[in-house]
Every structure is written in structure tokens, then in C-alpha cells.
Design a protein with these regions (language model features):
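Short, low-complexity N-terminal intrinsically disordered segments enriched in polar/charged residues
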Residues: 1-27, 31, 137-148
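Short N-terminal micro-motifs specific to bacterial/archaeal maturation
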Residues: 16, 43-44, 118
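A solvent-exposed, acidic/Ser-Thr-rich amphipathic alpha-helical stretch
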Residues: 23-26, 30-81
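Secondary-structure boundary/capping motif
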Residues: 12, 29-30, 50, 54, ...
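A beta-strand edge to alpha-helix "cap/lid" segment located at domain peripheries
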Residues: 1, 5, 58-148
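Short glycine/serine/threonine-biased micro-segments
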Residues: 18, 37, 95
Length: 148
């Protein structure tokens, strides 16, 4: 039962991100949550403050304004005070009018329903190519340094 609730909350967070509702999304995060996006791209990050985590999601929204997520599978384990959620997700968007699709592995640690650690492993080669296209289209954030 707890796994189903966690899966529902996870999808609810992704839907908030699709809508660009960062307040709803970040309400699921603990104030001391960490976020790691592996890679040396504009979304690359190793963050540990609520302000920086919000700034990362703001950059994400600017880079992919019409994003859609499709959860392929997820697994939940552990008690409510140290729950682990792992998901395989496909992301779709468009870049300069052309379709963009990628996939990522998402690992969350939750404490009493709040995200305390967020780790994202995306196909960085595909994402780096997308950033080149975005930069060529004039999006400044697409050539920004990782957020460390």
C-alpha cells in the first residue's frame, strides 16, 4: 500500500513539473534536500540548498518548456522514514520545433513522504546534443555551466 502511495505522489510531482508548478513540486521536497544530475551539461548539478534546487528546476523549465514524462516502471522499498524510489522515465519535448526524446533513471530517498535526496541519471550524450541545438536556437541557458 505504501508503495502505491509513493508511486502516486511521484507521478503527481512529475505532473506538477509538466505544468511548471514548482511550488507544488517543491512542496514534496525537504528543505535540506540534495539534488544531483550527473553530467557536465547545463543541467549538471550537485546541489544542497532549497534555493539552488529551485534554481535548477527553473533552468530545467526554461530549457524544456513543453516537457512530458512517461513513467515506464518504478520500484519502492524501505520504511516510510527511509524509503527508496527508483524509476525509469521517458521524457518528451521539442527543441526548435523538432521532437526530443530521452530517458532517465531517477532515484529518490524519501523521509516521511518528503524527498531528501534526488539523483537523476539521463542519457547525457543525447542531452548534450539537445543543448547544442538549443544554444544554436539562441537559448542562453543551453550553454551555461553545470550548477555545482
Amino acid at each position: 500500500m505504501i508503495a502505491r502511495i509513493a508511486g502516486h505522489q511521484y507521478r503527481k510531482g512529475l505532473h506538477a513539473l509538466e505544468r511548471g508548478d514548482l511550488d507544488a513540486l517543491l512542496a514534496q521536497f525537504s528543505p535540506d534536500a540534495t539534488l544531483t544530475f550527473v553530467g557536465d551539461t547545463p543541467l549538471g548539478a550537485d546541489l544542497s540548498s532549497a534555493t539552488d534546487v529551485r534554481a535548477w528546476f527553473e533552468r530545467f523549465l526554461r530549457l524544456l518548456p513543453d516537457r512530458r514524462f512517461e513513467v515506464q516502471r518504478y520500484q519502492v522499498s524501505g520504511p516510510p522514514w527511509k524509503m527508496q524510489l527508483a524509476a525509469h522515465v521517458v521524457i518528451r519535448s521539442s527543441i526548435d520545433g523538432e521532437p526530443y526524446e530521452n530517458q532517465f533513471a531517477h532515484f529518490l530517498t524519501l523521509r516521511w513522504g518528503k524527498v531528501v535526496d534526488d539523483l537523476i541519471l539521463e542519457d547525457t550524450q543525447r542531452w548534450a546534443g539537445a543543448c547544442e541545438r538549443l544554444a544554436a536556437a539562441g537559448l542562453v541557458d543551453a550553454s551555461a555551466a553545470p550548477m555545482r
